[in-house]
């Protein structure tokens, strides 16, 4: 199922995501891992919307939560590139499929996920006390 799903999504390498991260301060990256995973190590500015809650939380993204109507938030987000990351790339691919089902098109799954990001030595943050 995951291999089939990955064939239907656009994957981006962590090197390319890092370039975009440096170039665009308002880059939309969503970490779909569970909160415990996210708190341990994450990409700065990535928002944590776990896979199981993604469709319900997407309209609350900080870049669009100024809208009073959920439809306006979803419309604005659907016009932007959105990069989804998980542990190794599987959950982000499944998340893309879910977002495509509600009308999103400009979606990218981070190939190799956080593991690839960490392996390349790119900056991370931790939210553990």
Residue ranges: model-predicted function:
Residues 84-85:
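Short, surface-exposed ligand- or partner-binding patches at beta-edge/loop junctions that are enriched
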Residues 1-28, 35-81, 90-129:
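Rhodanese-like catalytic fold shared by cysteine-dependent sulfurtransferases
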